[in-house]
Regions:
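N-terminal mitochondrial targeting presequence
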Residues: 1-41, 498
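FAD-site-proximal beta/loop scaffold in flavoenzymes
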Residues: 153-171, 321-324, 341-407
Length: 498
């Protein structure tokens, strides 16, 4: 028999002949679940989105002795990759293949349908594991804080995105798309995703969406949509826009649409471009060309035939959402006109001028917020993050964070990958220095799954998820789609537990 040598940076563990036969078989995957050694560092990750999986991936690759469990509130993994990435960006979802390899690694287990903070506490996880990593993302919405934001026809972008992407708690959203004009507040990538989807029922583009994993109810609603004009509003100027050039280029080239810009929003921009970093310069030049230059013959013809329009509106902040008389239905949004002041950083200042924009749909895309899942944890309610230093949670030894709960909802998936790797490196440094004591025997998932059973919670394993995955892909094949997502937790559990 060959005996494994498990190396870390400073320690050597040998599975020797003096151990019993049963101990020699620990670390082998049986029936889709890993059986682990009691003497190895045990780590659990809370959340199975990019932050959680990238942290797990780095730990498993860098520490051949670490044993890792991932806990997820929903029965299905992958978080924002499944529920946040736009359906017309399928290439971004390819990262799921890498995450699947991590989840199926012999030293990793996945436990879905476990609500940490309700089904099991952070302290209980700390008792069972040497280290706990919080990677549960940002489930809350930043509110506008203006009168009328609770009117019918006003939605958070997170909920709208969740609706067309199949997030279970958003399936009943049923947004009213019977109006002509929609206003999106915020100018990040999510705002532009929403704009593209709203303008989708056009010629061949709706046919393209039919080949994605957008949910069937959303596809049917969009096919009947009356939205013909989308305005994307930001409180600062073109040089401060938060989206990337890829998303702007997609808007410029969106079939059946034409841009509708205000030239005044771009006054003086050309003169300062020489001092702007190259990526920002290229993005701004594309906006300038779209807004100010006379299009060529082919582009002019395309714009003339367009039945829908979109445009950025800069230097505007929401003041109030207005209702139709004697109803609670949105009829317009009142915007304050801003000017920019530079005092170390660029900020928008009210001018006192306001304007009303007639619309029946308002979507607020001004940011997500992380939520506190355990009162024993520190939390910065203003920034909506867990206070940390390189992923080490303040005043909470052995507990770390990664992803948006660490940094706030910023950047793209690659940004989350880097910050998650940083957290994993911090943990490994602490293991090596002794700041994180991994010498004590910990029970890991053995005690947690027993505790959950006693509380009537039945976790979903990765093998169970693969049953759900199989059902979704088969349903999708029948419709010419990569998958047709199950839309309720009940449906998911029914499939997983059969």
């Amino acid at each position: 028999m060959n005996y494994k040598l498990l190396f870390s940076h400073r320690k050597l563990w040998t599975l020797g002949r003096r151990r019993s036969t049963s101990r020699l078989h620990e670390g082998i995957r049986v029936s889709g679940q890993a059986l682990f050694s009691s003497c190895s560092p045990k780590v659990c990750v809370v959340g199975s989105g990019p932050g959680g999986f990238y942290t797990a991936q780095h730990l498993i690759k860098a520490r051949p002795d670490v044993e890792l469990d991932i806990y997820e509130r929903l029965p299905v993994p992958f978080g924002l990759v499944r529920f946040g990435v736009a359906p017309d960006h399928p290439e971004v979802k390819n990262v799921i293949n890498t995450f699947t390899q991590t989840a199926k690694h012999s030293r990793c287990n996945f436990y879905g349908n476990v609500n940490v903070g309700r089904d099991v506490t952070i302290n209980e996880l700390k008792e069972a594991y040497h280290a706990v990593v919080l990677s549960y993302g940002a489930e809350g919405n930043r509110t506008m804080g203006v009168p009328g934001e609770d009117l019918a026809g006003v939605y958070a972008a997170k909920d709208f995105v969740g609706w067309y992407n199949g997030l279970p708690n958003c399936r009943e959203l049923n947004p009213d798309l019977s109006c002509e004009t929609a206003v999106i507040l915020g100018q990040g990538n999510v705002a532009l995703d929403v704009a593209r989807i709203l303008l989708a029922p056009i010629n061949d583009y709706i046919l393209f969406l039919q080949s994605t994993d957008i949910t069937q109810p959303a596809l049917e609603a969009l096919a009947q949509s009356q939205v013909r004009r989308v305005l994307i509003v930001g409180r600062r100027g073109p040089l401060q826009i938060a989206c990337t050039i890829k998303e702007i280029r997609e808007m410029v080239n969106l079939p059946g649409t034409k841009p509708e810009m205000l030239p005044a929003d771009f006054e003086g921009i050309s003169e300062v471009l020489k001092d702007v970093p190259r990526p920002r310069k290229r993005l701004t030049e594309l906006m300038l060309k779209t807004a100010l230059e006379t299009p060529g013959e082919k582009e002019l013809e395309r714009r003339k035939s367009a039945s829908r329009s979109w445009g950025f509106r800069f230097f505007r902040s929401p003041v109030e959402v207005l209702a139709e008389p004697r109803t609670n239905k949105t009829s317009a949004i009142r915007l304050a006109v801003n000017r920019l002041e530079v005092e170390g950083f660029t900020r928008a200042v009210l001018t006192g001028e306001v304007e009303d924009v007639t619309c029946g749909l308002v979507i607020s895309s001004i940011g997500y917020r992380s939520l506190l899942i355990d009162p024993g944890l520190p939390f910065d309610s203003r920034k909506a993050i867990i206070p940390n230093s390189m992923g080490r949670i303040q005043h909470t030894p052995g507990v770390y964070c990664s992803g948006w709960v660490k940094t706030g909802p910023t950047g793209v998936i690659a940004t989350t990958m880097n910050n998650s790797f940083d957290t994993a490196r911090s943990m490994m440094e602490d293991m090596d220095s002794g700041a994180l004591d991994v010498s004590a025997v910990k029970s890991g998932s053995q005690s947690i799954t027993a505790l959950l059973r006693g509380r009537g919670v039945k976790p979903v394993t990765f093998a169970d998820w693969e049953k759900i995955d199989s059902v979704e892909t088969k349903k999708g094949e029948a419709e010419g789609k990569p998958r047709e997502k199950l839309l309720s937790v009940e449906e998911m559990l029914q499939v997983a537990q059969t």
